[in-house]
């Protein structure tokens, strides 16, 4: 799990704890504070992904800037990436996930940090955008986001279906 700008593994700890309770081997990025792009980040993420790929392709979850790192990593190593889930990431036109990797962009119109339109990417056969209610800084603690992530991770590798909120949670998703 990759934190946003200025974030660390402590930032993503609650969401990783939740995923571990569901049986996933959720791990932090292990690179200290996310201070942007650089060779040390690229090399560190490549090393981290290689260490995780022993059990097969890994799903990458990136919050804000962490989502941009996830997309760049998936472009370099699509064979080692099972899926990408971005949370409030300013993807724009430059960071559209590679078509060979299933991708979900979670965004909020009330983000207040990242303009929500930058998180909306063209949808496709294995690419979707899911709108939630909430703030940018709250995305990692938002039950609607946790539900999307849990649902996406639970999908079989060979079958991709867009996210559909359970009836009891539909009010959490303005457009779905």
Predicted segments with their positions:
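Serine-dependent carboxylesterase/thioesterase catalytic core
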Residues: 1-10, 14, 18-106
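C-terminal catalytic-base region of ester-bond hydrolases, centering on the histidine
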Residues: 101-176
């Amino acid at each position: 799990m990759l934190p946003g700008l200025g974030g660390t593994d402590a930032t993503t700890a609650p969401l990783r704890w939740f995923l571990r309770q569901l049986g996933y081997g959720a791990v932090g990025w292990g690179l200290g504070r996310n201070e942007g792009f650089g060779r040390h980040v690229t090399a560190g993420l490549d090393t981290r992904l290689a260490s995780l790929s022993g059990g097969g392709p890994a799903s990458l979850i990136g919050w804000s800037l962490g989502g941009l790192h996830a997309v760049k990593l998936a472009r370099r190593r699509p064979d080692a990436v099972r899926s990408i889930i971005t949370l409030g990431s300013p993807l724009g036109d430059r960071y559209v996930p590679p078509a060979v990797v299933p991708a979900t962009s979670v965004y909020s119109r009330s983000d207040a940090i990242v303009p929500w339109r930058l998180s909306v990417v063209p949808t496709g056969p294995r690419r979707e955008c899911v709108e939630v209610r909430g703030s940018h800084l709250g995305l990692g603690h938002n039950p609607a986001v946790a539900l999307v992530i849990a649902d996406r991770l639970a999908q079989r590798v060979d079958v991709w279906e867009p996210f559909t909120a359970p009836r009891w949670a539909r009010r959490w998703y303005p457009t779905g």
